[in-house]
Design a protein with these regions (language model features):
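Short, polar loop motifs at secondary-structure junctions
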Residues: 48-55, 103-105, 123, 188-190, ...
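Amphipathic alpha-helical segments that form well-ordered structural scaffolds
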Residues: 31, 35, 58, 83, ...
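Catalytic core and acceptor-binding pocket of nucleotide-sugar-dependent glycosyltransferases
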Residues: 141-222
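Aromatic-acidic/polar surface patches that form glycan- and anion
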Residues: 18-29, 77, 129, 158-162
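Short, solvent-exposed loop/turn segments at the edges of secondary structure
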Residues: 133-134, 203
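N-terminal anchoring/stem segment of glycosyltransferases
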Residues: 1-73, 211-219, 223
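GT-A fold catalytic core of metal-dependent nucleotide-sugar glycosyltransferases
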Residues: 68, 75-133, 140-141
Length: 223
C-alpha cells in the first residue's frame, strides 16, 4: 500500500487526505488513524516531520504513501504548507492529527473550489478578535493554487517564534483578498474545541478539532 514519495517519482492520486507530525505529536497517530479509517475510504498520505521509527512503521502500515520532510529547513507546523505544495494529489485535504473524525468526510472533496484554499471559518478567533479568521486544521485545494504557493513562500521568508502557519496566512490577506482566495467550508468539517466548550455550538460535527493543551488532555482521556 505504502510508497515513500520523492520529488522525482510519485504516484498522483485523484483525491487524498494528508496529515503529518513530528515525534512530539506522534502519540496521537494511532487514535487519529482509528477514527479516520472508520469514516473515510480515501487514500491517506502521511508527512513525516520527524517521528520515531516505531511511529513511522505504524503509518507505513496504514497509509498509502509517506512524504519525507525530516530534512527540510522549515520547523514544526511551518512544514505544513510545504507538505501541501508537494502532496501528490489532484484534490488534497490536509487534516491535523488532533482532529477527531466522527462521521463520513469524503464529501468534502465535492465542496472544493479551484484556485482557492477551502477552509472553515475560525469562529472562536473571529468572535474574540473582531477579524475574520480561518482555521488551518483542515485545508482543501484543487491542484496547487497560487495562494498556496504564496503561503508557502511567506512561511519561508517571515516565520516568527510567536506565529504558526495559520497566523502567517491571516497576515497575508485582507478582507478583499480573503473573498478571492478563501472558500468557506461548512463548519461541521472543522468544529473547534472552544465552540463546543464555551460558545454553545450545537450543530453537526464531522470533524472535532481538539485544539490547544486542553484539547490534548481530552484526546489523552480517549486513548
Amino acid at each position: 500500500m505504502q510508497n515513500t514519495i520523492t520529488a522525482k517519482h510519485m504516484k498522483l492520486y485523484d483525491e487524498a487526505f494528508v496529515t503529518g507530525c513530528d515525534h512530539s505529536q506522534e502519540w496521537m497517530l494511532h487514535w487519529f488513524i482509528k477514527n479516520f479509517k472508520k469514516h473515510s475510504s480515501k487514500p491517506l498520505i502521511f508527512a513525516n516531520f520527524g517521528v520515531t521509527d516505531l511511529a513511522l512503521n505504524i503509518m507505513r502500515e496504514n497509509c498509502h504513501a509517506i512524504m519525507d520532510l525530516t530534512d527540510v529547513e522549515e520547523k514544526g507546523w511551518f512544514k505544513k504548507p510545504r507538505t501541501m505544495v508537494n502532496c501528490p494529489a489532484k484534490k488534497t485535504v490536509w487534516i491535523d492529527t488532533d482532529c477527531e473524525v466522527l462521521d463520513n468526510i469524503d464529501g468534502i472533496f465535492d465542496l472544493l473550489k479551484p484556485d482557492m484554499l477551502n477552509m472553515v471559518k475560525d469562529e472562536p478567533w473571529t468572535k474574540r478578535t473582531g477579524q475574520t479568521w480561518h482555521n488551518s486544521g483542515v485545508v482543501g485545494f484543487i491542484d496547487k493554487p497560487i495562494i498556496l504557493h504564496q503561503w508557502y513562500r511567506a512561511v519561508k521568508t517571515r516565520p516568527t517564534v510567536a506565529q504558526g502557519d495559520q497566523e502567517v496566512l491571516h497576515s497575508m490577506l485582507n478582507p478583499i483578498t480573503k473573498i478571492k482566495y478563501i472558500n468557506d467550508l461548512p463548519n461541521e468539517y472543522n468544529v473547534l474545541r472552544l465552540q463546543v466548550e464555551t460558545d454553545g455550538y450545537a450543530g453537526a460535527i464531522k470533524v472535532m478539532h481538539w485544539t490547544g493543551q486542553k484539547g490534548k488532555t481530552k484526546i489523552r482521556a480517549m486513548l
